[in-house]
A protein has these predicted regions:
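Bacterial signal peptide processing site
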Residues: 21-25
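N-terminal helix-rich structural modules
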Residues: 44-231
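Contiguous, non-catalytic segments that form substrate-binding/exosite surfaces or channel walls
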Residues: 201-393
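An active-site-proximal "capping" alpha-helix that borders the catalytic cofactor pocket
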Residues: 225, 433-450
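Post-HEXXH active-site segment of zinc metalloproteases
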Residues: 412-438
Length: 582
């Protein structure tokens, strides 16, 4: 890792970077240049410039792990009204960025401003990586600080940094009338002279939600699509009330060439309690034909639930509308543009809406294709036994992504705690996200196999699916085991290896999937994860993640072989006026 390389190696990296950057004097602070000139003339200036570049080299190497890519869509078929509405939606989406910055850490705005005013190469590199990570901690390296000395707060910007879980629970026990507000997805917990208090998002982020709501209403006026109009107006109202129920249902009913997903959704950022949702936005252009081609799978959801390898008491009856949308991204903001870019999502998370209408699965087609070509296939070619690389397949990868999202809507939704029906998310708290991502991954593979059995996919897809699924886990574990998807992927790799479903060649470090054993191992893991969720067993969840959610020496060896392959992509959106760097 560059952060710990010998000085001589670091200087070689600096020389390479210097060659790429040219001799722009703006890259070196003026004061060191002056001092160097006084001491050694041009040679001193060059030495100072080299030292400055050398200091920035480790951060620049981290930045290079995120490949710049252009993501666009064909807008030629959009009516003028929808094209005009699209611009308003992009403007509204941009306002999710300042909210996310504060949700990630209260100190983010001030620190970013400080970095932006410092022209030194190291500060400029830190600023660029700060913008990728959306904060001063490296999400790919156990939240190691790179632009601050402060440790990463588990509660992000949602709670007082000195508040413990015990204090939170005691406050609720002493003030039971405040439980709903404190456990709400859409409140910030603050401390004042009287103690803790829950502040609604609508109040805490009014400075940005107010203008965003106005832009959504303007887009609603421009659009001629009735479902988009209804959703935009309902979501604008929700920004002022924190009641997202009606607008979540309206979002489920969207049938528009232009769509936006905007609001507080995922709780990954809250590593303290797993309660608080971050704001994000996806602005997309739909492909109705591709969506219709996949619509048949939503009709299988009840059958998939019944086919799960778990006791009937663990199975959940949900709404079955569950639309599937194939879209191309034209802009993202907030939590959707932080570090690793999601390739699909399954929303809303509100179990009340899911019980009534199911959940919508949205596949980001242009991003899925880009990641397979830039990252997924190259990883498979490095970590897999050569005899199995022929099974790497973009369509198998696409279906695993789809069925991952479908699987978020399957399995236990509620558990019983002290005689009360409780959302599994609340019962498992900080362990929920990693466990749920692991469940969706492995259950996704389980359900594609079921669709092969039902004749929806050809039998020839089986080996492609199993090998592509396994290789994809290495893509995810590179995100870091401090991140839910990465930790969930590590859990799966370790469980599959333990079951003999994958083996490592000690001489090459390459993995080989045992195509005869992996199906049983997949079913066993689905059963174990669902059992923990059904029982709401936080202790068992923590124990499972502690044992298996780590990078083993063999996995680390495989990851070390991926040098030069991007960890993820860094999107640029030309529709939003962004230009891909040369």
């Amino acid at each position: 890792m560059l952060a710990t390389m010998p000085r001589s190696a670091s200087r070689l990296v600096a020389l390479a970077l210097l060659a790429a950057c040219g001799s722009d004097p703006a890259l070196v602070p003026s004061e060191p240049n002056k001092m160097a000139a006084d001491e050694g003339g041009p040679h001193g200036i060059e030495e100072a410039r080299m030292n400055a570049q050398e200091a920035a080299a480790p951060i620049l190497a981290k930045i290079q792990q995120f490949a710049p890519v252009e993501l666009s869509a064909d807008l030629s078929g959009l009516p003028d009204s929808e094209r005009a509405a699209l611009d308003k939606l992009i403007a509204a989406a941009r306002l999710m960025d300042p909210i996310l910055d504060r949700q990630s850490w209260a100190g983010n705005p001030a620190l970013r401003d400080k970095l932006s005013r410092d022209g030194a190469p190291l500060a400029r590199a830190k600023l660029e990586y700060f913008d990728i990570m959306r904060g001063p901690w490296d999400r790919q390296d156990h939240n190691t600080p790179f632009a601050t000395e402060a440790p990463h707060p588990a509660g992000a910007g949602f709670y007082p940094e000195d508040m413990s879980v015990d204090e939170f629970k005691k406050w609720i026990a002493d003030h039971p009338d405040q439980r709903a507000a404190f456990e709400s997805l859409t409140t910030v917990i603050e401390r004042d002279s009287l103690g803790l208090r829950a502040r609604p998002y609508a109040e805490a982020y009014k400075q940005w939600l107010g203008p965003a709501a106005a832009l959504l209403r303007e887009a609603a006026e421009l659009s001629q699509n009735p479902t988009l109009k209804t959703f935009l107006r309902a979501r604008a109202d929700a920004f002022a009330s924190d009641d997202y129920y009606a607008s979540d249902k309206a979002w489920m009913d969207l049938d528009s060439p232009v769509e936006i997903t905007i609001g507080p959704y995922e709780t990954y950022e809250d590593e303290l309690l797993g309660l608080k949702a971050t704001f994000e936005a996806f602005v997309t252009v739909s492909d109705p034909k591709a969506s219709a081609d996949l619509a048949r799978f939503k009709n299988y959801l009840p059958d998939m639930e019944q086919h799960l390898p778990i006791d009937d008491v663990m199975k959940t009856k949900r709404g079955s509308e569950s639309p599937i949308r194939v879209v191309d991204l034209v802009f993202t903001a907030g939590d959707a543009r932080k570090s690793v870019q999601t390739i699909a999502f399954n929303l809303p998370n509100d179990e009340k809406v899911r019980a009534e209408k199911g959940a919508k699965k949205v596949l980001l087609r242009n991003l899925i294709a880009t990641k397979f070509n830039v990252i997924m296939r190259p990883i498979g070619e490095r970590v897999l036994d050569p005899s199995q690389q022929v099974h790497l397949d973009d369509q198998a990868f696409f279906q695993e992504v789809l069925f991952h999202e479908l699987s978020h809507s399957l399995g236990p939704a509620f558990t019983t705690v002290a005689g009360q029906k409780v959302d599994v998310r609340l019962a498992l708290a900080g362990s929920y996200s990693a466990l749920e991502e692991a469940k969706a991954d492995v259950m996704g593979a389980y359900n594609v196999l079921y669709m092969i059995e039902r004749g929806e996919f050809p039998a020839t897809m089986r080996d492609k699916l199993l090998v592509s699924y396994f290789a994809g886990l290495f893509r995810s574990v590179r995100f870091g085991v401090e991140e839910a998807h990465g930790k969930g992927a590590a859990l799966q790799i370790n469980r599959l290896v333990e079951a003999g479903a994958a083996t490592v060649d000690p001489s090459t470090g390459k993995y080989k999937v045992d195509l005869g054993k992996i199906e049983a191992a997949i079913a066993a893991l689905v059963r174990d994860l669902c059992t923990i969720q059904h029982n709401g067993d936080k202790t068992a969840a923590e124990a499972l993640l502690s044992k298996y959610g780590q990078v083993s020496p063999d996995t680390q060896r495989a990851l070390d072989s991926l040098t030069g392959i991007p960890v993820d992509v860094r999107p640029y959106y030309p529709v939003a006026g962004e230009i891909l760097p040369k």
